[in-house]
Amino acid sequence: MGSGFSLFQKNLSSCYGDRDLLQPGLGDLPESCVALILQNLDPVEICRFSKLNTAFHGASWADFVWESKLPPDYKLILEKILGSFPDNLRKRDIFTFLSRVNSFDEGNKKAWVDKRTGGLCLCTSAKGLSITGIDDRRYWSHIPSDDSRFASVAYVQQIWWFQVDGEIDFPFPAGTYSVYFRLQLGKPGKRFGWKVVDTEQVHGWNIKPVRFQLSTEDGQHSSSQCMLTEAGNWSHYHAGDFVVGKSKSSSTKIKFSMTQIDCTHTKGGLCVDSVVVYPSSCKDRLMQI
């Protein structure tokens, strides 16, 4: 790809007129050839080079260029998000839509396609999870948070039995995915207009470890445990990985949980924001969530 970039950079001037009119340049390439070039670039690069000249702009709308960037099951993904597959959409329009963060399941889930890799990403809010005791205001409450994609998080003040369960049924494209719980020790708030985190009620998480579990309908399973120790910052705790095979052309159902049910002590002061499913190759992008 690097050599392709250098070729473009060396010939940029040829599109604008600082060359001999008898010398061929990028502006002379037929649109069909340009489309074949663009097919080998990532979506961000395609959009950048579409501004180069008329041929590049026209080629950037070719359906076969964007078909290669879309997840193979993009129709199923659109149906899951929208409830039906819209007619008369060009492939570039479909990619543009999917690369935005789209809400579904009454706003409790969000899904999008990574613009660089084309990998599918998904997250489900605390309200989309099954949390033991969530309706008892002595223990749990939903509080607003600017740090959440869903504008609110679940906060446990104090509890003996801590259990959070969830499941996702979605047409994931083939690949390996990682599941994370996004958590924070401490209660978010504001003081004099500044964001603050109150850690006064944080307790009990360094006595016994929290157990994270993940399973799929085809028998994959993983389990891990760790202490929660980092107060005041949002952290992603790995629940496990799962693999979607290339031959699968339907939804994949996963179940996951986070528990600390040792009732010899209470624990509290924890925010549960969401559960995130990300292509394992894109772990470095987690901090952007």
UniProtKB/Swiss-Prot annotation:
Pathway noted in the entry: Protein modification; protein ubiquitination
Q: Does the keyword Nucleus apply?
A: yes
The protein's predominant localisation is: nucleus
Q: Residue limits of the F-box domain? A: 23-69
Please indicate if the UniProt record lists Transmembrane as a keyword: no
Q: Which keywords does this Swiss-Prot/TrEMBL entry list? A: Nucleus, Ubl conjugation pathway
Record localization: Nucleus
Q: Which GO terms describe its cellular component?
A: nucleus
- Return the InterPro entries for the record: F-box-like_dom_sf, F-box_dom, PP2-like
Intrachain disulfide bonds: none
Question: What are the recorded GO MF terms, alphabetically?
Answer: carbohydrate binding
- The protein's superkingdom reads Eukaryota
* Gene Ontology biological process terms, A to Z: cellular response to hypoxia; protein ubiquitination
Q: What is known of its domains?
A: The F-box is necessary for the interaction with ASK proteins.
How is this protein organized at the quaternary level?
Part of a SCF (ASK-cullin-F-box) protein ligase complex. Interacts with SKP1A/ASK1.
Q: What does this protein do?
A: Component of SCF(ASK-cullin-F-box) E3 ubiquitin ligase complexes, which may mediate the ubiquitination and subsequent proteasomal degradation of target proteins.
**Protein name from the UniProt record:** F-box protein PP2-A11
Q: Which organism is it from?
A: Arabidopsis thaliana
- Gene for this protein? PP2A11
